[in-house]
Structure formats: C-alpha cells, structure tokens
Amino acid sequence: MVDILPHPSFLGDMGDHSKKKSGIAMCVGCGSQIHDQYILRVSPDLEWHAACLKCAECSQYLDETCTCFVRDGKTYCKRDYVRLFGIKCAKCNIGFCSSDLVMRARDNVYHMECFRCSVCSRHLLPGDEFSLRDEELLCRADHGLLMERASAGSPISPGNIHSSRPLHIPEPVPVRQPPHRNHVHKQSEKTTRVRTVLNEKQLHTLRTCYNANPRPDALMKEQLVEMTGLSPRVIRVWFQNKRCKDKKKSILMKQLQQQQHNDKTNLQGLTGTPLVAGSPIRHDTTVQGNPVEVQTYQPPWKALSEFALQSDLDQPAFQQLVSFSESGSLGNSSGSDVTSLSSQLPDTPNSMVPSPVET
C-alpha cells in the first residue's frame, strides 16, 4: 500500500505525534533522508521521495493516479508487471487478454489456436485425448507412434516422428510391360477374394466364445456355424486372427512395461502422460502480487481553512494562525502568540478533527 503523507515538520505541534511514531524517514530509492512536504509510503514500511518512486522498467512515476506492484524490492507499473511476470501461453509465449478463452494442460496455459499437436498440428478439441511430453502436446495417434518407436529401441522424441511420416506420395507412373506368354500371365494373376463383413450380433457371439475358450473344438465350431450363419472357414480364420492380435498386443505391452521400468531405473524416463482436453475456460487476469492502494491525507491547515469559511471566526486572527501553520513556525518560540490567538477561537467540535481521506 502507498500512503501519501505530509512530512511531520510541516505539521508543527499537530505533527508531533506522527513524528514520534515514524521517526526519521529514509528514502528506499536514493537512500537519503526525506525532507519533502509529502512522503510516499509503500506497504508495509517502504518510504520514498515523490521523485524516486517510479517503475523500474519504463521509469513512469507512480502515485495515487496509477497502480504499482512491488517485486524483489523493485516497483513496477501494472503494464510492465503483467508483461514481465504475468501468465503467458506455453506455445507462443504471448500474454492473454481478459476476453481470451484458454486451454490448460497441467500447469501450462494455451491460447485456443495454440492448443495443437506439435507433430501434425492438428487442433485439439474438447474431448480429444492427448499427451504432454517434454512440454509438447501430442495427439493420440502421434503418441501411439512414439510408443511404437520406443518399443523398437529407437530414440524417442517428438521431433523424430516427422521422419517416419510420408511427406509426399508420388503419382503412379505407367510403365510399358513386355509381352508375356499366356500361361505366365495367368499364373501372375491372383484370385480375388470376397471380404466377409460381420455384423454386431455375429461379432458378439464370436467374442463371447473366444473369451470362454480361445481354441474351440470341432463341436463348438459347428455350433458357431449354426448360431452365426458363417462358414467354417470364416470362423476358423477369425479365431486365428484374434489369437494372433492378442499375442502381438501382449508382447507389445510387456515391451512397454520393460521400457518404462528401465527408464525409471536409469532416471531417463520421459513417458508422456495421457490426458483429455477439457472445455475452454475464461482467462483469469488476476496477477500475482499485491496491488498498491493509495491514500491521501489532507493537511491540517486546509481543514481549518474550510472550517473557518463555514463559521463566524475573526478572519484577521484566523489568517495569522493559518500563516503560522503553513510556514511551520508554530513551535515553542511562538507559543505565547498561539495562546493569545487560540483564546479568540471558539471551541472546535471533535467531529471537525481532520482525518485521512481515502481516494
């Protein structure tokens, strides 16, 4: 908090109490004693000259007309404080406006347009699965490709995925084929097979049987033929493919677990954490730090002047009293004059004692 206080020497007897309380005022900026009429006090106990309290970056003077922040013993205006210490986008390193919608991934904050996969630049929408690896965002497909390369023993980093992606697929170029004999041409031709498409009911029946017994006997296969209406060859091939897929998946999971165990043992594990993108939220512009609150105090002679204008006082005697208060000569040497003047003044009610006015 910054308080604008009149210097005790300008208050005369009225300033004795604050003088005893504050002691000698030393400026934090220049280190010299403050003799000015006003002291800028920064909460809790930092005191400045009015000419010394300014922004450490842009040298803008800080007073009751602006907000300032204190960090590491330095004072900043609001604009420079937000620029230097405010929250910035983890992708473009640019700050946020109060109207910006942001996406959060752990401790990182992103603009809506910056929330993209670092490999394929696909925009990640709410509900999409992604991972955060080396402070870079990866979509689910690129994260899976990265894990496959890790299981194969290749160096894993998001930048290595670019090399495994086809950059351009060339158009087929027609090539003139030399004439072949008829029997050779017939042997090179492959017979076209019809692809069997299973419906949900057939798949559910086959999966239920597979979970109970991955290797059904001949009797079970005959029952499946009657229940699904598929040929024995299709059922046999489906079970073979299913066992092969499960075996590959089991081997891959073991390799991934072994790789993760080795990474943790060697303190080199950088496994991406799978996350799910949430809905964008409005950025909170509240900056960390205590904003400066400014208070101004009205000089006592000004309060007396306003009181005199609203009451029936002897104007010549009162003007003489005000001149003594302004010049700071209302001390022990002029005590007799003050006594004679104060006898001419009416009693001042307690409600008219000047008090600080907050602005």
Swiss-Prot record:
Q: Which CDD domains match?
A: homeodomain, LIM1_Isl, LIM2_Isl
Region ranges (Disordered): 171-190, 326-359
Q: Name one GO cellular component term.
A: nucleus
**Matches recorded under InterPro entries:** HD, Homeobox_CS, Homeodomain-like_sf, ISL1/2-like, ISL1/2-like_LIM1, Znf_LIM
> Where does the record place Low complexity bias?
326-336
Record's SMART domains? HOX, LIM
* Record-linked Pfam families: Homeodomain, LIM
Q: Which residues bind DNA?
A: 191-250
Q: Where in the cell is it found?
A: Nucleus
Q: Which residues form the LIM zinc-binding domain?
A: 27-80, 30-143
Q: Which GO terms describe its biological process?
A: angioblast cell migration; axon extension; axon guidance; axonogenesis; exocrine pancreas development; neuron fate specification; positive regulation of transcription by RNA polymerase II; venous blood vessel morphogenesis
Q: Which GO terms describe its molecular function?
A: cis-regulatory region sequence-specific DNA binding; DNA-binding transcription factor activity, RNA polymerase II-specific; metal ion binding
Instruction: List where Polar residues composition bias occurs.
Output: 337-359
Q: Which UniProt keywords apply?
A: Developmental protein, DNA-binding, Homeobox, LIM domain, Metal-binding, Nucleus, Repeat, Zinc
Its biological purpose is as follows:
Binds to one of the cis-acting domain of the insulin gene enhancer. May be involved in subtype specialization of primary motoneurons.
Report what the protein is called.
Insulin gene enhancer protein isl-2a
Q: Which organism is it from?
A: Danio rerio
Which gene does this sequence derive from? isl2a
